[in-house]
């Protein structure tokens, strides 16, 4: 059986269960050729599970999948790649000691040239075509998170994918890196690529997508044209009820100073500086948020404060009942 080829992908009545848990229930999803479709939903709504079936990681219990007008059976990532589908996951699958270009050609079927200069040239041309900023000869362990993501995207493009799935691609990016990624995605769309972005960030959905498909608790709620919707409507479709996006926060009455971090510096497990002269104070009766993209030192900060991670400079002091006592001594009762 076949369906209209104007759709790059059609998923009909797809269901996936894990034991007694239903991750996706009778889901219908359509991706048009040459569009950017946002797949929107709360955490746990089944977005990634649905796309894992399209990329061959999971196999649906029920339902049909059509790619470029033909019904297909996708039992593995190899089947998915053969259909021109490539998925970029949240957690990168790169070999740190290899270069960008080496990672991109790693695992390719057939005869692959071992001429590094030729490989670097081809990867560089592909990166330039879509507007990526990447040195093909750079080792992965020297790359930023954004550069590693670029390598993952180029990997699927190099294999010939024209249907791309990006799982929470901006979760680890700065606002500037996010805007650069969106520019690249628009260039890919102009080149005829069909793109699905899994996300729950409403502002980014409205900025980059052509249409928005919404999942809620594993079920398909509907699809809307991005130009005809707003954050309020999308939120209601995600949650199932109207939600006020305006938060009225009362003024906090701070108590005594409880924690003082002074010029704290530490290295991560790879010997790279994770914290560099970090200073702040926390007061009783308040909730202090620590913000930053993944890998910015939040984990090392919390573990150092708790005495689980050594510092190479600075101090962490408990203030209050025993003013000026190091936190580690306070925890140990010294």
Task: Describe the residue ranges of each PLM region.
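Glycine-rich phosphate-binding loops of nucleotide-dependent enzymes
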Residues: 2-334
């Amino acid at each position: 059986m076949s369906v209209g080829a104007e759709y790059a992908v059609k998923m009909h009545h797809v269901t996936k269960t894990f034991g007694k848990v239903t991750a996706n229930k009778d889901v219908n999803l359509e991706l048009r050729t040459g569009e950017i479709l946002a797949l929107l939903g709360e955490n746990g709504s089944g977005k990634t599970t649905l796309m894992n079936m399209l990329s061959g990681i999971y196999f649906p219990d029920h339902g049909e999948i059509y790619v470029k007008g033909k019904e297909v059976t996708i039992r593995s990532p190899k089947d998915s790649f053969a259909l021109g589908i490539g998925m970029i996951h949240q957690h990168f699958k790169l070999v740190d000691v290899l270069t960008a270009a080496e990672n991109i050609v790693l695992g390719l079927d057939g005869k692959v040239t071992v001429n590094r200069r030729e490989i670097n040239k081809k990867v560089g041309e592909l990166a330039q075509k879509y507007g990526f900023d990447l040195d093909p000869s750079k080792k992965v362990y020297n790359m930023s998170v954004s550069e590693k993501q670029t390598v993952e995207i180029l990997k699927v493009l190099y294999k010939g994918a024209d249907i791309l799935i990006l799982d929470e691609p901006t979760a680890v990016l700065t606002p500037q890196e996010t805007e650069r990624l969106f520019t690249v995605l628009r260039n890919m769309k102009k080149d005829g690529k069909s793109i699905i972005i899994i996300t729950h960030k409403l502002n980014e959905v409205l900025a980059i997508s052509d249409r928005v498909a919404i999942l809620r608790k594993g079920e398909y709620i509907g699809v809307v044209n991005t130009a005809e919707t707003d954050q309020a409507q999308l939120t209601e479709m995600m949650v199932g009820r109207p939600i006020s996006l305006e938060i009225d926060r009362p003024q906090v009455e701070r108590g005594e100073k409880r924690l003082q971090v002074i010029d704290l510096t530490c290295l991560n497990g790879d010997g790279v500086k994770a914290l560099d002269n970090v200073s702040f104070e926390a007061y009783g009766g308040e909730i202090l948020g620590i913000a930053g993209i993944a890998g910015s030192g939040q984990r090392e900060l919390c573990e150092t404060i708790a005495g689980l991670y050594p510092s190479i400079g600075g101090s962490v002091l408990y203030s209050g009942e025993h003013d000026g006592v190091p936190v580690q001594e306070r925890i140990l009762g010294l």
